[in-house]
Amino acid sequence: YNEKGEFGKNGTSRMAMMFISDWLNQFGRVKKIPVWSEYLTGDDVTVGEHSKVISALQQGGAVVARVMYGCWHYVLLTGIDEKRVCLFDPYYRKKAFKQAEIKLITNMPYSYNRIVPYDIMNDTGKGPYSLGPKETREAVIIFNKETQKTPAKTIEYFI
């Protein structure tokens, strides 16, 4: 139910996101597929140094995050640089954003179509691509366990 009490008009529920994370983990175990997922909420859903979201992206994972864009919906975070997140937003858009810092990308259709600064994503308000109030934040981290860049797989030994 949405804020007006209308059934089926509140988008994807938090319970659905928890379910998909659990389902991916169980499916991976049963079918021997190297997928791993973790459901995050609240303070764990932030973009910045030492955050689980950034750590996942640095290790080659992807993150499904709930953001504001006129209404709450989900985007796929696929990469980062020092101060920005690369993400795929399923909402099609041709016009540039009023916020010049939010970049519309048209030449990376299989990777991302937006670049958004960390500070815009970490905003607790309802601006475009804001993660919103900490108490309502949620995200799902997804990894291919065979391609995940863990310290054990990336450390080089010198003699």
Residue spans for each PLM region:
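Conserved active-site-adjacent core of cysteine acyl-enzyme catalytic domains
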Residues: 1-136
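Mixed-charge, low-complexity intrinsically disordered regions
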Residues: 1-2, 70, 137-159
